[in-house]
Amino acid sequence: NFIILNKIIDVNRTLYIPEILKFSYLPELIIIEIYDDPSTKITNKKSTIFVEFNNNNYEYILDSICLRDIKKQHVGCFITLNKDDYFFDGDSKHRIKLEPWNSETLLNKSKIITFTRESAKFNLMSGYQILYYFRNN
């Protein structure tokens, strides 16, 4: 079971992600969708978020992000594999590379990620993105 946070809290309107979320049930997965324009203004993306349920706090860990490139033509993914951070771009010749991304500093920093000068350019502070958080406890 999962929950799409935007159905409950419009992060694209409020321009922030709450510190602690409260739901009527405990999902395995929380999905946060951030649109193009708000992506430049939401500066509190977290690698860990918490849900309060039945007077207990549950931890959710950011596992992956699907991100559209800055020209709005292509999608790449930041993924976690064996506890390491990678960037995947199926359109690139090399396709996957080790790329540390899962920290508050990097999640909220304007930094171009690309494989080569000719390939698509991605930026976590500029583009449509979907964040996937899995329950850790």
Regions from the PLM with identified roles:
Residues 1-137:
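UBL (ubiquitin/ubiquitin-like) substrate-recognition surfaces
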